[in-house]
């Protein structure tokens, strides 16, 4: 299991007192492909409740900037992740509103919601948000 996947699993809201967690997704764009190498984690300044996460701490941007510099510009900000206290998460109205207002970029942005049993993965491109969870028919 990769370190990034292990970190996502460690923040799942498995107990009734668990609070939402979240951060940035960092990695490399290789043409049409995206390789996730790192994430920022919740920390000082962030707002965390059972049903809400607000990324407020400066440490998220500092990690993006640090990895960008260390990699000579290869590692970049790819998007956002956070948890939901549900087995099979779906974006809330608040999630969608936040992504549309706050994620302004020319490149597609990765969106991940970590649930207790599964995850929701999506891409935001312009004002379009699409789930990547649908199965692809290979027949």
Regions found by a protein language model. Name each.
Residues 1-77, 86-139:
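Conserved beta-strand-loop surface patch within small alpha/beta domains used
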Residues 83:
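Conserved residues at the C-terminal ends of beta-strands
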């Amino acid at each position: 299991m990769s370190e990034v996947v292990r970190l996502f699993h460690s923040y799942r809201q498995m107990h009734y007192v668990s609070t939402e967690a979240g951060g940035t997704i960092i990695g490399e764009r290789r043409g049409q492909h995206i390789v996730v190498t790192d994430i920022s984690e919740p920390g000082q300044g962030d707002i965390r409740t059972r049903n809400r996460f607000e990324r407020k701490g400066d440490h998220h941007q500092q990690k993006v900037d640090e990895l960008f510099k260390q990699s000579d510009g290869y590692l970049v900000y790819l998007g956002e992740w956070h948890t939901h206290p549900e087995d099979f998460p779906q974006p809330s109205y608040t999630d969608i509103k936040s992504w549309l207002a706050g994620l302004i970029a020319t490149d597609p942005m990765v969106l991940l919601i970590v649930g207790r049993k599964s995850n929701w993965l999506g891409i935001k491109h312009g004002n379009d948000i699409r789930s990547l969870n649908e199965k692809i028919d290979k027949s």
